């Protein structure tokens, strides 16, 4: 093996991604360049959250080495992270033309099919990978998760059994692959069976794990002891999980959240809030459900999405990604703040974003439950004249406990692994919502989670009236809906409305520091 490659490969395995990036950036522009340098550079950029730079890196590599299949399969995974499904599909098809039995390409294809909600095809591809190479931990894990997706979609117990079987097999064959244990913990009730809990405890005593492996299994153990109502042990593992995860995240994330709020306020302190001809804007109704994560957005989404002629997008990135990418962009800001270009720009954005929703479904009512859309209320009102905004809130201590004890995959949730950061985020969120309520008081529908679950008929009738939708009691069968929603706790999506999470924080308040300072 090339000496430089050996050295960089060791750094990559030690997770020293910034050092890998520094070295490979020089090597890809040298005469010594070989495809693995592009792979290591692109994958390292992705590991530190720079997916767009990673994609550019792989594009450059493919131009130099058009027949290198590893570059094509790797760029496909990055494009899936960026939700560029068409581009990912093209990259995969190009790779399959080179070798239709390449395990990494088949693995990427399985992930594409999952993202397309084609779970049976995903299962077929992950099976192929496992048959070709039985030592492929992620393929077996995603085979189990695809069966879980299919179980949610069909409500067929057979697929839940197959999901558990493959996830348990993955945990046994690859004990170091602890994300499997976390997925299993969302499926199992440890008050009924503690075999997996014992295996996890045995695993943490026997294996030497890095922080990335630790936080998955610690979150899983926290959940297992909570099922058994052993709250002190549960909190010990929840705290360990958050401490392990928090070591790996951006330390300035709260500064970024506050800066985003300031920028949005500056814009709406100076911007026009309407255009002269609203008929030029996207006309279909989009219902935005906003609030803190774990506040009940999923429950609201499932209820509304069970009505006729609606399509639930879940936590869609369509709207929020556009503004996250542009809120600090000087060109974007100048166009919306300049009176001459304002109207044309707003019309273009409205129809561009609306068109992305519309390309997925022919239904007339769209539902987007991305909680962090609370940052963009002003843009929602400006861009979509027929939109509805629903703000759901929950007992703040229950809400924050639920945030603290759960693991979120998205990088924009990295603030959630520290009590102090959760407290600061809540303060920023409240400040942002107060700003919007002053501007759009009668256009934001307020609903409390506790009222919704305790008085479901009365509250949903008022909710549907606000949304100009027809109500009927069949909406309470939402949990039988075949629509698959990916959320933190997969077992909650397929349950009817329940009240057991009210006052759940009372079991943990004595262990908290910062969060006890929060009041409703």
Residue ranges and their predicted role:
Residues 164-166, 170, 182-185, 197-208, ...:
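PAPS-dependent sulfotransferases, especially Golgi type II membrane carbohydrate sulfotransferases
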Residues 12, 46, 73, 80, ...:
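Position-specific recognition of the canonical hydrophobic site in helix A of tetratricopeptide repeat
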Residues 30, 64-65, 98, 132, ...:
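Structural marker of alpha-solenoid helical repeat scaffolds
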Residues 279-384, 392:
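Phosphate-binding active sites in nucleotide-utilizing proteins
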């Amino acid at each position: 093996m090339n000496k430089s490659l050996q050295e960089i490969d060791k750094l990559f395995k030690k997770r020293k991604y910034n050092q890998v990036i520094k070295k490979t950036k020089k090597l890809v522009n040298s005469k010594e360049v070989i495809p693995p340098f592009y792979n290591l550079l692109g994958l390292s950029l992705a590991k530190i959250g720079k997916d767009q730079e990673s994609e550019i890196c792989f594009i450059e590599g493919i131009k130099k080495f058009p027949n290198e299949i590893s570059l094509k399969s790797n760029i496909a995974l990055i494009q899936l992270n960026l939700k560029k499904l068409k581009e990912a599909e093209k990259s995969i098809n190009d790779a399959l033309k080179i070798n239709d039995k390449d395990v990494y390409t088949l693995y990427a294809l399985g992930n594409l099919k999952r993202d397309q909600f084609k779970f049976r095809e995903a299962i077929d591809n992950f099976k192929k990978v496992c048959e070709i190479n039985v030592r492929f931990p992620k393929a077996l894990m995603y085979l189990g998760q695809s069966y879980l997706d299919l179980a949610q979609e069909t409500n067929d117990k057979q697929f839940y059994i197959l999901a558990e079987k493959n996830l348990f097999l993955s945990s046994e064959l690859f004990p170091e692959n602890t994300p499997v244990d976390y997925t299993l913990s969302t499926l199992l009730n440890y008050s009924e069976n503690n075999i997996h809990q014992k295996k996890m405890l045995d695993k943490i005593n026997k294996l030497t794990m890095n922080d990335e492996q630790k936080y998955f299994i610690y979150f899983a153990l926290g959940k297992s002891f909570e099922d058994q109502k052993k709250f002190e042990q549960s909190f010990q593992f929840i705290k360990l999980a958050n401490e392990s995860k928090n070591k790996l995240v951006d330390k300035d994330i709260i500064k970024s959240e506050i800066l985003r709020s300031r920028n949005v306020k500056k814009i709406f302190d100076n911007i026009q809030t309407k255009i002269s001809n609203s008929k030029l804007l996207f006309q279909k109704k989009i219902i935005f459900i906003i609030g803190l994560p774990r506040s009940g957005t999923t429950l609201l989404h499932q209820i509304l999405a069970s009505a006729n002629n609606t399509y639930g997008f879940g936590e869609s990135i369509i709207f929020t990604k556009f503004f996250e990418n542009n809120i600090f962009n000087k060109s974007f800001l100048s166009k919306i703040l300049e009176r001459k270009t304002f109207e044309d720009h707003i019309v273009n954005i409205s129809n561009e974003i609306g068109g992305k929703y519309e390309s997925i479904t022919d239904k007339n009512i769209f539902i987007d439950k991305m909680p962090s859309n609370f940052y963009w209320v002003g843009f929602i009102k400006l861009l979509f004249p027929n939109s509805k905004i629903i703000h759901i809130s929950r007992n703040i201590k229950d809400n924050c406990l639920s945030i603290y004890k759960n693991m979120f995959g998205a990088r924009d949730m990295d603030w959630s692994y520290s009590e102090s950061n959760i407290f600061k985020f809540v303060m920023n969120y409240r400040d942002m919502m107060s700003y919007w309520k002053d501007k759009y008081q009668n256009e934001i529908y307020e609903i409390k989670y506790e009222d919704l679950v305790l008085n479901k008929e009365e509250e949903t009738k008022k909710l549907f009236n606000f949304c100009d939708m027809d109500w009927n009691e069949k909406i309470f069968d939402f949990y039988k809906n075949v629509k698959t929603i990916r959320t933190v706790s997969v077992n909650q999506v397929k349950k009817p409305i329940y009240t057991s999470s009210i006052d759940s924080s009372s079991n943990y308040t004595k262990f908290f520091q910062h969060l006890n300072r929060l009041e409703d």
